[in-house]
């Protein structure tokens, strides 16, 4: 044992130094280039840590032959150590003459295997077939001749190693464990292999390149302790200081290089895209299945088998459905324009489900018979016409619109469907498309009638959004023939309207329509005027299908631009027309019975128009309702267009007068138009009386109203604005400008403050001096509306004394029925009433006899109108006698005679306003043209009976006490006494004579 230990170390050193001189026993190649050798040396070096005793034992190992233990021929020879090291990794399956065969070979096996028969084969006969993992257990393989032995070394063999060494030193073959002998030989091979691996790794440059990792960024090994290695790929590595986001230390666990990160992101993106596509496919599959079910119910029985096959396989319902439409790809290229075309071609016959109907059309287009017919009438599957059918002669024209629309889709102009091609019969409530399923065959049959002039004209006439009269509308619905249309054309030609006035009239009729309806109305009005001469217009409509959508868009923009300048053109046209023809010819008065009646167009443009035969109603611009604007201005837009002033109608002398009056109405509050109207001669006074009283745009006063109620209660109503009437007197402006910010009014019964003038004729819009509105919505809801409602319910009025005049405010329910609302709401209006002023030197202590009291206003209510003139004469004679008596007693009349308030104005020669204790103030000068045909009318010849107070005083005609003052027809007050003999005294003082 001592010799073996001593000889162990020199053998190990020599083996490591002279390892290159050996050759492989398998392939006879140098050990440095042999693959068998390299594979054996690739094991771990962990076994080098085994103690030196094992190396010494391996150096002096013996081979066994049978049950006898024989020494190897070379026992621990120092010179042969380099030969043994080259064969250390091979296992030799030797027979009985193993020693002699190894002696003849060039290399001597110092560490030989144990060739055993009964020792190894008895307990473990399957020892040769043991398989060991080369990576985990670092086992070596060798083959020599026919035998192969695979050994496994483990941690348990380390304990058996010492026993094996002890048994082999004593040459006790039977005592050596069968597995221990194999482990002993394996350990000997591993020790020599580790020695060979060290020397081989130092001399082989290829092994160095495989083991060293290089940074992908800098390309250098750098600091290996800061080199992070990719967890996915084998060659990805990067220093922590070379990373895009520098790390302080090498990341532990899962880390990916840049390339792997990019690849991972790409994979995730692909997966997400794939999921989205799958979800879309699922949704489309469900929708497609649902559509197939609906489609299955709509199609005939002959097609249900084919459709049922698609319903049974929903996965195939997406792509195969497109293949079935391949024949009509050019026609069904775009889905949305096709739906829009279907909407227009059905003439606004709305279906319950346009989308499903369009889907059902796809299958119907494939049928060889009547496919185009079904595409035009597919909406009839789900709906029926809800209005009266159109005439038979209009069907060819409607059919042409459908056919042109379909041709446009084939040519790629699916969006170029003009509004003129769709029926606008809904606007006039005249007609709509009949059941397409019933008349579809007739449309297809009458294809050749496209160029028929009567069909073209009848269609154009039916498309007009305004009708001349219910009679004309009835003719269109019943006849639809060229004869009735020619009659209408003759009516139009008989108008002889000037171009500018006609265009203004048309624009004024349509100014309250929506923009789309205006464009359609102008286009169709032009069609009607073009068809007056009877020239067929079918070619123009045929060419409509060939226009591009750009041309249609430009045309619509041009029409919109023209409509924007409508107001300026209207004013200019009215001014020019009225100045050009200031007088109305009378020789054409009987001619207007042949004219089409003037249409009454309301704000909705959707009602039938009334025919008033030969009498034209006075169109007025009375506003109805309240709508506050940002600056406190009311909205002057009107919702009513026609009304008769003084409940009368008059006949204008000619067509030009009719057109002019219609054109003036929307701009009646415009100063330029008003000036033109005032410049008109007196030949047509009734035209001036048609002017309406409306608020001016700017408010004249804004403040609060303090209403004094009974029992010393008061209520404050803030945010009230006063607007001056367009017919108010200029004196009203002077008074209103002196109003304080808070006006105090008394709440009184309306009958007690109702002017006597209103008791006979009633209050009219011309009597309104001021309009009262709320400045905003909040003020209206909190203050204005409760005040108006209270006054209407309790029949109250507001009364106040301001600047020497009396202000009376009433609710609008006291006005005529057509003037009671502003934007559909009640409002407040006010008038002024002049007050009497006493003489400068009145007697103070003279009692007032009961007979000298003025007759009560209530007694005037039931007087006999036939006695008015005689009562006037008696009253004048009484005043003369009163003045004479007073002059006889006092010698002079009251020098302090004063006129009544300046608001009572006399207009023209021979015209005087007569008022007593009360009189309306603020009436427009235009009321001078308003003539009353009753017995109370006093003509200018009778008004020459003016009474001069000075002359009466000089003649001494005034008698009686001076404490009673009466007003003469000149508005002069004087002190006199009247013996009251008759209670039914004429109340001429409260009427206005013209």
UniProtKB/Swiss-Prot annotation:
Q: Does the keyword Zinc apply?
A: yes
Distribution of this protein across tissues and organs: Expressed ubiquitously.
- Basic and acidic residues composition bias: residue spans: 45-54, 119-140, 148-163, 469-478, 536-552, 858-875
The annotated consequence of gene deletion is: No obvious developmental defects. Enhanced accumulation of intronic heterochromatin (HC)-containing genes functional full-length transcripts (e.g. IBM1, At3g05410 and RPP7). Increased expression of At4g16870, a transposable element (TE) of Copia-like retrotransposon origin, associated with methylated status. The double mutant aipp2-1 paipp2-1 exhibits multiple developmental defects, such as a dwarfed size, early flowering, small leaves and poor fertility.
- Give the top-rank taxon of the lineage listed in the UniProt record for this protein: Eukaryota
What protein name is recorded for this chain? ASI1-immunoprecipitated protein 2
Biased composition range(s): Polar residues: 60-102, 417-435, 449-464
Q: Where does Zn(2+) 1 bind?
A: 215, 218, 239, 242
Comment text on domains: The PHD domain (212-263) recognizes specifically unmodified histone H3 lysine 4 (H3K4me0), binding affinity being inversely proportional to H3K4 methylation level.
GO MF terms listed in the record are: histone binding; histone H3K27me3 reader activity; zinc ion binding
InterPro entries documented for this protein: AIPP2-like_SPOC, PHD1-3/5-6, Znf_FYVE_PHD, Znf_PHD, Znf_RING/FYVE/PHD
In the UniProt record, does the keyword Transcription regulation occur?
A: yes
Q: What does this protein do?
A: Together with AIPP3/BDT1 and PAIPP2, cooperates to form a BAH-PHD bivalent histone reader complex able to read histone H3 lysine 27 trimethylation (H3K27me3) and low-methylated H3K4 histone marks in order to regulate transcription, especially to prevent early flowering; promotes AIPP3/BDT1 binding to H3K27me3. CPL2 is subsequently recruited to form a BAH-PHD-CPL2 complex (BPC) in order to silence several H3K27me3 and low-methylated H3K4 enriched loci, including AGO5, via the phosphorylation state-dependent inhibition of Pol II release from the transcriptional start site (e.g.
Which residue numbers delimit the PHD-type Zn fingers? Answer: 212-263
What keywords are assigned to this protein? Answer: Metal-binding, Transcription, Transcription regulation, Zinc, Zinc-finger
Gene name tied to this protein: AIPP2
Q: How does this protein assemble?
A: Component of the ASI1-AIPP1-EDM2 (AAE) RNA regulatory complex composed of at least AIPP1/EDM3, ASI1 and EDM2 and may contain CPL2, AIPP2 and AIPP3/BDT1. Part of the BAH-PHD bivalent histone reader complex that contains AIPP2, PAIPP2 and AIPP3/BDT1; the BAH-PHD module associates with CPL2 to form the BAH-PHD-CPL2 complex (BPC) for transcriptional repression. Binds directly to ASI1, AIPP3/BDT1 and CPL2 but not to PAIPP2.
């Amino acid at each position: 044992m001592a010799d073996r230990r001593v000889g162990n170390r020199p053998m190990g050193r020599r083996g490591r130094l002279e390892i290159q001189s050996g050759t492989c026993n398998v392939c006879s190649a140098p050990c440095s280039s042999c693959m068998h050798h390299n594979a054996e040396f690739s094991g771990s070096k962990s076994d080098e840590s085994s103690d030196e005793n094992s190396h010494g034992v391996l150096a002096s190992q013996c081979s066994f032959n049978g049950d006898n233990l024989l020494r190897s021929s070379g026992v621990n020879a120092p010179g042969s150590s380099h030969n043994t090291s080259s064969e250390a990794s091979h296992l030799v399956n030797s027979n009985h003459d193993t020693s002699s065969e190894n002696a003849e070979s060039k290399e001597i096996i110092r560490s030989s295997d144990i060739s055993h028969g009964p020792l190894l084969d008895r307990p473990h006969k399957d020892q040769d077939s043991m398989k060991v993992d080369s990576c985990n257990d670092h086992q070596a393989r060798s083959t020599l001749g026919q035998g192969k032995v695979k050994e496994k070394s483990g941690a348990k063999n380390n304990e058996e190693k010492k026993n094996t060494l002890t048994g082999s030193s004593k040459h006790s073959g039977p005592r050596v464990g069968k597995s221990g002998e194999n482990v002993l030989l394996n350990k000997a091979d591993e020790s020599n292999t580790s020695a060979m691996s060290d020397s081989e790794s130092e001399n082989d440059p290829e092994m160095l390149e495989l083991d060293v990792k290089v940074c992908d960024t800098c390309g250098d090994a750098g600091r290996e302790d800061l080199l992070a290695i990719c967890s996915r790929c084998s060659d990805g590595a990067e220093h922590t200081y070379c990373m895009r986001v520098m790390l302080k230390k090498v990341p532990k666990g899962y880390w990916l290089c840049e390339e792997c990160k990019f690849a991972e992101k790409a994979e995730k993106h692909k997966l997400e895209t794939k999921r989205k596509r799958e979800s879309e496919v699922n949704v489309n599959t469900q929708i497609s299945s649902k559509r197939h079910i609906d489609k299955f119910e709509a199609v005939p029985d002959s097609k249900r088998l084919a459709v049922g096959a698609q319903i049974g396989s929903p996965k195939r319902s997406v792509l195969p459905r497109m293949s079935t439409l391949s024949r009509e790809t050019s026609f069904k290229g775009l889905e949305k324009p096709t739906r829009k075309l279907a909407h227009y071609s059905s003439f606004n016959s709305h279906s319950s489900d346009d989308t499903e109907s369009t889907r059902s059309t796809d299958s119907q287009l494939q049928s060889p018979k009547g496919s185009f017919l079904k595409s035009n009438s597919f909406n009839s599957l789900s709906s029926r016409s809800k209005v009266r059918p159109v005439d038979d002669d209009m069907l060819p024209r409607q059919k042409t619109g459908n056919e042109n629309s379909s041709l446009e889709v084939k040519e790629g102009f699916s969006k170029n469907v003009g509004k003129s091609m769709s029926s606008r019969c809904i606007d006039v409530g005249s007609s709509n498309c009949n059941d397409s399923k019933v008349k579809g065959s007739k449309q297809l049959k009458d294809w050749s009638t496209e160029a028929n002039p009567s069909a073209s004209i009848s269609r154009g006439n039916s498309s007009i959004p305004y009708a001349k009269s219910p009679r004309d509308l009835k003719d269109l619905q019943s006849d639809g023939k060229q004869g009735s249309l020619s009659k209408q054309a003759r009516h139009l030609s008989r108008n002889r309207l000037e171009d500018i006035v006609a265009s203004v009239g048309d624009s004024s009729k349509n100014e309250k329509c929506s923009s789309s309806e205006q464009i359609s109305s102008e286009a169709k009005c032009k069609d009607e005027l073009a068809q007056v001469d009877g020239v067929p217009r079918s070619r123009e409509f045929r060419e409509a299908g060939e226009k591009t959508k750009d041309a249609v868009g430009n045309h619509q923009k041009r029409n919109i631009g023209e409509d924007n300048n409508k107001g300026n053109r209207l004013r200019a046209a009215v001014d020019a027309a009225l100045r050009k023809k200031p007088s109305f010819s009378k020789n054409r008065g009987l001619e207007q019975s042949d004219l089409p009646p003037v249409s009454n167009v309301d704000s909705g443009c959707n009602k039938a128009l009334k025919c008033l035969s030969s009498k034209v109603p006075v169109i007025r611009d009375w506003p109805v309702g309240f709508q506050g604007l940002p600056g406190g201005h009311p909205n002057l837009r009107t919702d009513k267009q026609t009304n008769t002033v003084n409940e009368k109608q008059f006949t204008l002398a000619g067509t030009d007068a009719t057109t002019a009056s219609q054109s003036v109405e929307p701009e009646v509050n415009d100063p330029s138009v008003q000036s033109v109207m005032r410049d008109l001669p007196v030949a047509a006074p009734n035209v001036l009386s048609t002017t309406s009283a409306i608020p001016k745009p700017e408010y004249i006063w804004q403040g609060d109203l303090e209403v004094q109620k009974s029992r010393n209660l008061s209520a404050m109503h803030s945010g009230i604005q006063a607007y001056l009437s367009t017919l108010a007197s200029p004196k009203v402006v002077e008074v209103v400008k002196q109003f304080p910010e808070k006006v105090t009014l008394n709440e009184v019964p309306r009958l007690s403050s109702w002017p006597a003038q209103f008791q006979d004729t009633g209050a009219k819009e011309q009597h309104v001096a001021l309009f009262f509105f709320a400045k905003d919505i909040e003020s209206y809801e909190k203050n204005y509306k409760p005040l108006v409602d209270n006054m209407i319910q309790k029949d109250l009025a507001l009364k106040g004394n301001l600047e020497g005049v009396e202000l009376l405010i009433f609710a609008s329910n006291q006005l005529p029925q057509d003037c009671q609302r502003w934007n559909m709401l009640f409002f407040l209006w006010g008038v002024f009433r002049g007050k009497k002023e006493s003489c400068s030197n009145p007697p103070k202590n003279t009692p007032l006899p009961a007979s000298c009291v003025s007759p009560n206003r209530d007694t005037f209510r039931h007087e006999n109108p036939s006695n008015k003139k005689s009562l006037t004469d008696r009253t004048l004679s009484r005043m003369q006698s009163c003045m004479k008596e007073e002059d006889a007693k006092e010698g002079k009349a009251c020098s302090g005679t004063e006129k009544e308030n300046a608001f009572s104005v006399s207009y023209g020669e021979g015209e005087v306003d007569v008022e007593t204790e009360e009189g309306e103030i603020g009436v427009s000068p235009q009321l001078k043209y308003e003539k009353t045909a009753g017995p109370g009318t006093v003509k200018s010849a009778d008004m020459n009976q003016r009474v001069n107070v000075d002359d009466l005083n000089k003649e001494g005609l005034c008698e009686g006490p001076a404490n009673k003052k009466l007003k003469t027809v000149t508005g002069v007050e004087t002190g006199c006494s009247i013996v009251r003999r008759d209670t039914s005294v004429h109340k001429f003082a409260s009427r206005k004579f013209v």
